Swiss-Prot record:
Signal peptide: none annotated. Residues 263-291, 309-327 have a biased composition (Basic and acidic residues). The keyword Cell division applies. Residues 50-60 have a biased composition (Polar residues). GO terms for cellular component: chromosome; nucleus. The gene is AM1. This is Protein AMEIOTIC 1. Disulfide bonds: none annotated. PANTHER family: PROTEIN DYAD. Disruption phenotype: Sterile phenotype due to male meiosis arrested at leptotene. It is found in: Nucleus; Chromosome. InterPro entries: DYAD/AMEIOTIC1. Plays a fundamental role in building the proper chromosome structure at the beginning of meiosis in male meiocytes. Required for the transition from leptotene to zygotene in meiocytes. Required for homologous chromosome pairing, and initiation and progression of meiotic recombination. Regulates meiocyte cytoskeleton organization.
Amino acid sequence: MDVETVQAGPALAAHLQLQASPKPQVKKYYFKKKTSSSHSRNGKDDVNHDSTIQPRSPLSRQSLTFDAIPTYHAGAFYEIDHDKLPPKSPIHLKSIRVVKVSECTNLDITVKFPSLQALRSFFSSYPAPGTGPELDERFVMSSNHAARILRRRVTEEELEGEVQQDSFWLIKPRLYDFAAPQQVPSRTLCLPPPPAPPAATLGLTADSCLLTTLKCDGAGWGMRRRVRYIGRHRDEAPKEASVDGYDTESSVREVQQPPATQEVKRSERNCKRKREAEASSKDNNGDEGKKNNKVQGASKKISKKAKKRTVESKDGDPRHGKDRWSAERYAAAEKSLLNIMRSRDARFGAPVMRQVLREEARKHIGDTGLLDHLLKHMAGRVPEGSVHRFRRRHNADGAMEYWLEPAELAEVRKQAGVSDPYWVPPPGWKPGDDVSLVAGDILVKRQVEELTEEVNGVKRQMEQLLCKDDGDFGAERDYSSLKEKYQRAVRANEKLEKQVLCLKDMCENVVQMNGELKKEVSAFKEKYEHIADKNDKLEEQVTYLSSSFLSFKDQLVVALKLELAPSEAVPRTALFVASGEQMTGTVIQGGQDRAERKSSFRVCKPQGKFLLPSMASGMTIGRGASSTCPAAATPGPGIPRSTSFPSMPGLPRSSRGPVEVVAAASGLDEHVMFGAHFSTPPSASSTNDAAKLQLSLPSPRSPLQPQKLFDTVTAAASGFSPQKLMHFSGLTRRDVDTSSSSSGACGSGLLEGKRVLFDADAGGISAVGTELALATPSYC
């Protein structure tokens, strides 16, 4: 193999370099090449073929003997001999078995052949019968080379029967399983190759290496060079093992140098020579002596610096170095960088740039030398106690970017057989799955083709349906009308839905208002019931009061009739009104002029009670006495009495009768006592002093109206007229002038109490005044 072949394929050169090593697994494809059968096909003997055809330049243009050149037909397929291919032939041609002659001239012959991409596309699809792959590659060769390379013509029968088989186009089809491409198992690499002829070893090596390279998924086409850095204090740096099966920047390190005794001796000898030279030339040139001194000092500094720069390291790890930084500082700085990259979520596909990482790390790492050293040499390292590995590389713009990856990813790459140091398993990938790009491309292509066929079938069916619909115009019109009706129904349905929503909202509002109204009605009902209860109680009280007044009226009329005759002989009438424990007496004088008579009767709390005449029999009325109530006039304990009353002017003596009214108050009750002919109304019992006369006022809205005390006929028969009883029937309130009455303890109580004026001579009551009966009741 010459230099041109190595330049044509970088991967081929790398493979040849690996073949020089004693590993036998590189020769795994050598035994597949059979040169004897190829020579027998051509019908020529191997020895005669080599003796008659001398090696020439691939593009030689010397004169040719036309009788020795075979005739080639344009459009015919020929089988090629790979051993005779020139070095500058296309690299893809080394894996092709047959080619097609497209053009023939006296000097050149042009052949066409399919590329590997065209073969993949052809075999991954479903080719039609009688078709072949696309011949997208072309190669022009001389007539002499064509005579050596094109060994035989492919027959028509063979072409028709095997054109759709991969063995027809490829020399080793098992390496190109286009249906399910997989790599050759690694265990086959350990099989020793069978012995091959010495003459064909080089060609087979190139052929096998080429096929192996073509079979790769694309990760091995690049060229990587190992850079070895040798410092000024090192003559040669030993080769170190790469990290995770690939070279990184951290693979090149300064290692510990053995004791540099020879360098020290050499420097000492140089120093001695310089000192001797300085001593010999000291007298001749002083400047040269100074210069030599400077050189000597510089050499000493260099030797000391070389001693200091010896680094003690293990496995190329700078964390164990003791030159400038301790292992603790290394660990702390690496931890800071790891935390920063974790906080920024630096991962593959979303790295962090060097400038950003350095600016952030400067806040935690003060030594810029240590920081720059770590940024340069931390790639491929796994910090202590972490499960992530530092990675870095240059992006397309040339900027350095850093990220973190799982520490076990390197072992996964090694087990998967991927040589790309930046390969990341795709989502859903499992150990044992194919990692080649070709497998994924073929699978995607098949799926796309299947989907395309399904879509085409659907399109055909739609076209057929459209054709049928075009013939039936009535159905189309019906369909359009039904579609319009459906759209109208949809619009009407939408309107109805809106109306239903509005009605629903209104119903909810009405229900809410109904609930509020129910609450208000219940509240009003409770108030009404309360008012009705009050009204019932008031009506009962008014009814009771009316019955009391009626009974009082009847008794009063009867009493007045009975006392009408005796009252004429009585000169005056005495009235005792008791309020509390005091009693005030007033003497009412009767006269002919009744208009001059003034009297009033006021009933205050507590309520009054009438006494029978027998209870007032012990009372005596003294004539001409003062208005005070003496103790001798008291009928019983607690009731003051007055024996004499001052005569009132304007009243005749004949009208003053022995009528006595006593009002006694005990606790909350007030008892009013009239003459002997006055009886107690049925509502007020005379035997029980604690009985009360409820003087409840009628309601303003009560249907009960005040009634007349006397009937007209009865009043006329008795000598009373309605005009005389007008004040009594209406119960008109009148104020009494108390200035003319005498003052005293009993008199003040009489004036403050209730007053009643009786006219015995006239046989009636001139006026009756009371606050309870006269005041118009009102309720809140």
